[in-house]
Amino acid sequence: MRTIFLCLFVLALTTACDKDKPETPKAQLQVDIQPVFGGQTFYMDSIYTTQEGYKVKFTELKCYFTLFGNGNTSLHEAALLDYRETGSLLFKKEEDYTKFPSLSAVLGVDSSLNHLDPSAFPNESPLNISNAGPMHWGWSTGYIFMNIEGKVDTIPDASTNTNVSFSFHIGTDTYLQGLQFNNINWAD
């Protein structure tokens, strides 16, 4: 009986050992966008002065970026920069960053995605209607690519009375902008 128990114990021990090499975890790849205004780092709700002397305060900055990749290697289909909610963070993804010494993307929602049914995108996609919310106009015009809102002082003087609201909602396929980033240094 002891012999059977010993054999079963040794058998269990040898089969429980994992001889496969542990999988190397992929690095967390993170893309940040840092907006600037007139060469200054952009901060929401700060007051800036235009070249003409007008004071302006931005209260909303949102924009879509799509089709991140490098040649035929796709990285990320779509991301929404919501500067008030997430700051400069555009997206994080577990990926081998060495595949991306350069990166291309589209500022806006690429025409291959812009006119699709927004409810058909996966729930976690920023293009899904429940996530896009007011950033989607409708099926014919598609998504708002960039939403910039704020307040401005219409009298160029020493006052900082930013009391006139403005809103720019930019979209439609005409305003797509291709982006290319070369010689990327991914920080550790």
Model-assigned labels for residue ranges:
Residues 1-4, 18-19:
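Positively charged n-region of N-terminal signal peptides that target proteins for export
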Residues 13-16:
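C-terminal motif of bacterial Sec signal peptides marking the signal peptidase cleavage site
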